[in-house]
Amino acid sequence: MKVSLGNGEMGVSAHLQPCKAGTTRFFTSNTHSSVVLQGFDQLRIEGLLCDVTLVPGDGDEIFPVHRAMMASASDYFKAMFTGGMKEQDLMCIKLHGVNKVGLKKIIDFIYTAKLSLNMDNLQDTLEAASFLQILPVLDFCKVFLISGVSLDNCVEVGRIANTYNLIEVDKYVNNFILKNFPALLSTGEFLKLPFERLAFVLSSNSLKHCTELELFKAACRWLRLEDPRMDYAAKLMKNIRFPLMTPQDLINYVQTVDFMRTDNTCVNLLLEASNYQMMPYMQPVMQSDRTAIRSDSTHLVTLGGVLRQQLVVSKELRMYDERAQEWRSLAPMDAPRYQHGIAVIGNFLYVVGGQSNYDTKGKTAVDTVFRFDPRYNKWMQVASLNEKRTFFHLSALKGHLYAVGGRSAAGELATVECYNPRMNEWSYVAKMSEPHYGHAGTVYGGLMYISGGITHDTFQNELMCFDPDTDKWMQKAPMTTVRGLHCMCTVGDKLYVIGGNHFRGTSDYDDVLSCEYYSPTLDQWTPIAAMLRGQSDVGVAVFENKIYVVGGYSWNNRCMVEIVQKYDPEKDEWHKVFDLPESLGGIRACTLTVFPPEENPGSPSRESPLSAPSDHS
């Protein structure tokens, strides 16, 4: 039982605890600590009971204090007064690492728990707090710095953070500069940045709203401000993404700069850009830091599908914005697709085969292949398949694409094709032992795994493994359940098989809610939690180690569905997380690093070198 006295000034509370010997009372004063602190401060002011005098390193001003008080607040003073050091017996101690402004701030804080900070006294206070190990004061200094960062002082705050190793402040300054770099360019404040911070900014994927040409010109301005800075030219230019500039910008603005023609490193950077732009089909397997999209925004992306209403096939490419909790559109395909295959190489999205018209028999399968470049939000067509195919599986493995099985107007397919981006061509590799369609696949350990599907109108439970190095198929342990039109993905060292459908009895289809994972090491299947709702012919993607199953068709409900279910492998739990904008079957999904959509339309910074007029190249 707790009892508080009505007189708030006393600040007393009592805890009553009954016992055999009578009631024991425990009292707590809420004001005692502050009263004691005030008492010690008054003793210090009056010079009473002080047992040591501190002298700052930059003068003769003296500060009488109490050893016990200083030792209780600082490990530095505790070690000095109790650790057998010579200062333990001295009555006057000179502190060479602290000036009088900083020492006074520290002593005032220890005796009052109060601290006033401004930019004039901050560094003196920081230096003293760091030297004397007064952690609360260090924390107050960090808060003061972070709360006051602006365009005018961010460079100076960054210098202070670096000098005193204030990691949180340094990180905040980096983020602030990245977010506001265009403004710093316009004011010229960026010219005050040290090389290390400017190089970090120019290398960052989080740097937005600046073209590579603007960044190059800014780097040149910084280098030319002072002669010694020219020593950093090559190191700084390594952070400019020259391959993403247009050819005319490289010729008109970059090659005209003297050091870009004379410095060997800079010359090689221009050669790299030229070679990259001359080989557009090879770009997915030529990716480097200098060719990557300047974005740290990775999202779940969906493509195509057939709409529930009117059975119209979609050509929409969408990303899910987790913060806004809404879908945003990217550049749509030139033609609609469903039952297609998608895969990602080097953050380029390939869309292969499928159908443009609704047709459950696959008789309208196509062979065309398109590639989406998120850096410019643009599509381009690449080499077509050797065979039209739909209801097939597509994997990206070792820089190649593999299109496995499927069906077409000619019937079910056992053939497998491999796309080589370096040659921009498809070639046949070892085919499957039997034709399959409606199967699923994933990759792990340099191998491609294909599960289930339908062969000669019969649902399968087999698992096959393809080794591209030997061009051979191997049989592995079969699934515990037959299924087709399911999905498959890899998380860690486990290969997950999810959903799909199979025959109920002899003539009707049934959703398969059961799921399982395969261990390649053990060649063994293990059941996991069942789906909340049936989904077949879906999109599947792994995002932040969670599995997202998108849209599809529910055979039990006889309709396309709009739901997105998420599976957490660590918790073995399913959750319905959000919906598609509309119900879509035969949709596909992946994860892709993209620009937020508001940065895409009409932005000159997103102009593809490939779209440059030929008379300027």
UniProtKB/Swiss-Prot annotation:
InterPro entries: BACK (IPR011705), BTB-kelch_protein (IPR017096), BTB/POZ_dom (IPR000210), Kelch-typ_b-propeller (IPR015915), Kelch_1 (IPR006652), SKP1/BTB/POZ_sf (IPR011333)
Entries under SMART domains matching the protein: BACK (SM00875), BTB (SM00225), Kelch (SM00612)
A GO BP annotation: protein ubiquitination
Keyword Cell division: yes
Alphabetical keyword list: Cell cycle, Cell division, Kelch repeat, Mitosis, Repeat, Ubl conjugation pathway
Spans of repeat Kelch: 300-347, 348-399, 400-446, 448-493, 495-545, 546-595
Pfam families (alphabetical): BACK (PF07707), BTB (PF00651), Kelch_1 (PF01344), Kelch_KLHDC2_KLHL20_DRC7 (PF24681)
Subunit structure: Component of the BCR(KLHL9-KLHL13) E3 ubiquitin ligase complex, at least composed of CUL3, KLHL9, KLHL13 and RBX1. Interacts with AURKB.
Function: Substrate-specific adapter of a BCR (BTB-CUL3-RBX1) E3 ubiquitin-protein ligase complex required for mitotic progression and cytokinesis. The BCR(KLHL9-KLHL13) E3 ubiquitin ligase complex mediates the ubiquitination of AURKB and controls the dynamic behavior of AURKB on mitotic chromosomes and thereby coordinates faithful mitotic progression and completion of cytokinesis.
Protein name per its UniProtKB record: Kelch-like protein 9
Organism: Homo sapiens (Human)
